[in-house]
Amino acid sequence: MIYPIVPYGESILRQTAAPIELGTDLETLIESMFITMNAAKGLGLAAPQIGKSIQLFVVDVSPFVGDGMVQPDKHRKVYINPVLEIYQPNTITHYEEGCLSIPGIYVDVPRNKRVRIKFFDRNWQAQEEDLVDMPARVVQHEYDHLYGKLHIDYLRADRRLRLKSKLENIKQGRVEVAYKMSFTGNKV
């Protein structure tokens, strides 16, 4: 199943997602999230972006892996009830990020180059990973969604003001995208 993406302005994107009860059957939802993410040509997708306020996100960073081989089990990841740890000291890197919920708006976001994340995988096995570079960036972006933070929140006030009309157009559903979006009217 392909879910419609929840756009900027919907209140669910500003909420803290609820932890998921250990052992909950998520397999169908997880597969649908990967299908939805791929249909929208995304690198990651958080459950709030499909209208589910739960602590779950999926990522696929295979386009950024330089080994020449796509290894689905290695690059397609599921993160349930994640806890992100930032290494100190850490190097901050900048990169222009997009977001499926805010189409057409790209923001230079400072992120930690290296992070550690503790989570449950799709089989409810506790995991811990150290991530660097693009995988670390994608995980930080999706993790932010679980706490109501969007990539535009990293903008200076003057830059955000310049984007006000574009953001309002997205909020009102006046945006063209090649994937399904859901405009429910539950605005912030």
From Swiss-Prot:
The active site is at E142. Gene3D superfamilies: Peptide deformylase. Binds 1 Fe(2+) ion. Its cofactor is Fe(2+). Pfam families: Pep_deformylase. GO terms for biological process: co-translational protein modification; translation. Fe cation binds at C99, H141, H145. Coiled coil: none annotated. Transmembrane segments: none annotated. Its EC number is 3.5.1.88. PANTHER family: PEPTIDE DEFORMYLASE. This is Peptide deformylase.
